[in-house]
Amino acid sequence: LLTAQSMNAMKKAKRLIFRTAQHPVYAALTEAGVQSTSLDDYYDRYEDFDEMHRDMAKALWAEAEHHAVVFAVLDAGTDGAVRELRAQQPQDAVLRILPGVTLADACIAQLPGNLAPIGALRTIPAEDAVTAAADPTTPLLITEIWNRSLACDLKLRLCDVYGDELPTVLCLATVKTNRKPQNIQLWDMD
């Protein structure tokens, strides 16, 4: 799920920090001798994702005062910590986002042709989708449904907007496996 440019940046980084060691390339880079750390301990310390993202960004900017930092995430376009990095960016600091294959790209690539979106598609992480304004006229791709509790909250929210029986395509573990998308009713999501 990486471009050659992103992989090269990770291998050459003086300070490589993964949002999570669950990142698909973390183990491969570690086995190749690339030194890195992860921010997995933040998940145990925080219940509020917004607060966690703010503190991740603060820690990353503090680290960047001493070293050039490469921060590896699954999908920079939807990642809350990356949003906070942008929001907290010091005036004299440089922030470069390198392109990669997003979670949405991985999911869309697995969809049958008749379901592949043409035109507008709204991509949003699950933690934001629970409270985001709904637009039933735009196809919605929700990423990062990390646990059953979040899936349940999301299902209840979406059922309020779209109804229980909305045909839904569930793409599980698209970044780690080749599991095929499943056609389900929205009510069965969690």
Language-model segments: residues:
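Conserved beta-strand termini and adjacent loop/short-helix elements that scaffold enzyme active sites
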Residues: 39-41, 98-100, 126, 171-173
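Short gly/pro/ser/thr-enriched loop/turn and capping motifs at secondary-structure boundaries
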Residues: 23-25, 44-46, 102-106, 130, ...
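Class I S-adenosyl-L-methionine
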Residues: 1-98
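A polyampholytic, Gly/Pro-enriched intrinsically disordered region
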Residues: 56-64, 113-128, 186-190
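Structural motif
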Residues: 14-15, 36, 67-71, 95-96, ...
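Class I SAM-dependent methyltransferase SAM-binding "motif I" and its flanking Rossmann-like core
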Residues: 74-142
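A contiguous loop/helix-start segment that scaffolds small-molecule binding in enzyme catalytic cores
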Residues: 65-69, 131-190
